[in-house]
Regions:
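Active-site loop of classical SDR/Rossmann-like NAD(P)-dependent oxidoreductases
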Residues: 17, 308-320
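Conserved SAM-binding strand-loop segment of SAM-dependent methyltransferases
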Residues: 56-63
């Protein structure tokens, strides 16, 4: 069992993702204290302190003031995508372990700065890809490790919404976010797929992005109407990735697409021995005794959580528990920064291919 020493955490960015994921998940852990909150809108930091902070927690408008507090061991970066890199670099250089919300950065140059800072500081860095922690994803990963699928040579990473455009914050702002659904939700599906395949060596990719529905006024959006004039990112994006070993990945992402079969943070993998997907729970398919078979394991029986203080059915809580456990026991986090760097490189390649109309080759 992990040592129950207290880990003091600072939160940088107290908006939607911090309130919806990071702070509630950390709050469940008995050995975590959130002692500092920072936001450029000070009222958000104060509200976060009131709900999740210790009685003597501090609030800041400038993240560098938070980083100057030597008692803080861990920092969670929950800001818009463009600021992920420089805040994370500063936090690592200040001697903090860092969990940065996905994506790692808006491009590979900025992500490389984060990798360099992690190596320079010797501190831990992880990226918030909580989809790996779902029971279905964990099951598929174990089957892959056990060799159930054989050589995985094709996969499809899917993050498709019919009409679920995030209308709050800066999601629609190209400059702040670096893109739309591809970098927002496609990044989860791609990370999940690469992780299950255990393949992080892309050779080249081709991609397309579309701005077909973002100017519509007849929207039917799940989260209220968006402003067409401010919707500067793509509404959908698609990519095809060829890996160095010849395996291929089809990546689909959309906030708005005229389709019914919507799925998010899901993957399908095909190997020489069997296939698997997360389309309806977990499904494993193959041939046995000269007949096709379909296995749908029951992952919902009552049982103990994988980590004390976390709900086994909640990937965000599982992610936070695994992360703090890694800090306390000096082990690797589930998501290694080098893995997240590859995700960023592929996303960047798809965007670049979409701009040029040509394949993008990785060095």
């Amino acid at each position: 069992m992990a040592e129950k020493r207290i880990v003091k955490v600072g939160i940088i960015g107290c908006g939607g993702i911090a309130n919806g994921k990071h702070m509630p998940s950390l709050h469940k852990l008995p050995n975590v204290e959130m002692v500092a909150f920072c936001d450029i809108v000070i009222e958000r930091a104060e509200a976060a302190k009131a709900k999740y902070g210790t009685p003597d927690a501090k609030v800041y408008e400038n993240y560098k003031d938070l980083l100057a507090d030597e008692s803080i061991e861990v920092v969670h970066v929950c800001t818009p995508n463009r600021s992920h890199s420089f805040i994370t670099v500063d936090a690592l250089d200040a001697g903090k372990h860092v969990m940065c919300e996905k994506p790692m950065a808006i491009n590979s140059v900025e992500a490389k700065k984060m990798l360099d800072a992690q190596k320079r500081s010797g501190k831990k860095l992880t990226i918030g890809y909580q989809s790996r922690q779902s029971m279905g994803a964990q099951y598929l990963k174990k089957e892959a490790v056990d060799g159930t699928f054989g050589d995985i040579y094709y996969a499809k990473a899917t993050a498709l919404r019919r009409r679920a455009v995030p209308t709050w914050g800066v999601f629609l702002n190209e400059y702040e976010q670096g893109g739309g659904p591809l970098i927002d939700i496609g990044t989860h599906s791609l990370d999940l797929t690469l992780w299950i395949m255990d393949n992080y060596k892309p050779k080249y990719c081709v991609g397309t992005t579309y701005h077909k529905l973002n100017k519509d006024t007849n929207q039917g959006n799940a989260w209220g109407n968006w402003d067409p004039e401010k919707f500067t990112v793509e509404d959908s994006a698609f990519g095809f990735v060829v890996m160095e070993n010849g395996a291929t990945i089809n990546l689909e992402s959309a906030w708005a697409l005229n389709m019914l079969d919507v799925r998010e943070a899901t993957t399908l993998i095909c190997g020489t021995k069997a296939g698997g997907d997360l389309y309806d729970g977990v499904r494993i398919n193959g041939i046995r005794n000269n007949a096709q078979y379909l296995l749908k394991p029951n992952l919902n029986p009552q049982g103990a959580a994988f980590y004390e203080g976390a709900n086994a059915g909640d990937p965000a809580s599982m992610e936070a528990a695994q992360w703090i456990n890694a800090v306390v026991n000096d082990t690797d986090p589930c998501v290694l920064p080098e893995q997240a760097f590859t995700v960023t490189r592929i996303l960047e390649g798809i965007y670049e291919s979409a701009k040029t109309g040509k394949p993008y080759y990785f060095d």
